[in-house]
Amino acid sequence: MQNTLITIALRGITVLPRMRIYLDMNRPMSIAAATNAQKTNQNVFLVAQKDPSVENPGQEQLEQFGVIAQVKQIIKGPEDSFRVLVTGLQSAKLESIEEYVPNLIARVTVFESEKNDEQEIHL
C-alpha cells in the first residue's frame, strides 16, 4: 500500500517500529515537518541520511527504508533546538520525494505487519 507522508531526514540515528525515542532537531525543515504533522494529526516518515553532513538532502542522499511514526510531543529547547518524541509504527520503503518545501513529502510503500501484536518470539 502506498502513502504520501510528511518526511523527516534523520542524521546519525535510525528509528524502528515500536521504538519510542526523543529526537533532537535544529533544522528548520525538520522542525516544520514535526510541527505540521502534530498540528494535523498525521504520521511522518522517518528516514536516515546516508551522509549526516548534507544540510538539505534529496532522495539520493536518503536510505531506501525507514519507519512511519507518530509525533507524540514537541519540546522547545535552548536557542532554536527542539526535542521531538516519536513512536515508530511500521516499516516502509521510500519510493520518491514529491515535495521539498516547506518540508519533505515522500511517497512510501508500507510493509504490512506479518506478526500479530500478541505474538512473541522466544529463543
Language-model features, listed with the residues they occupy:
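N-terminal low-complexity, acidic/polar interaction/targeting segments
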Residues: 1-123
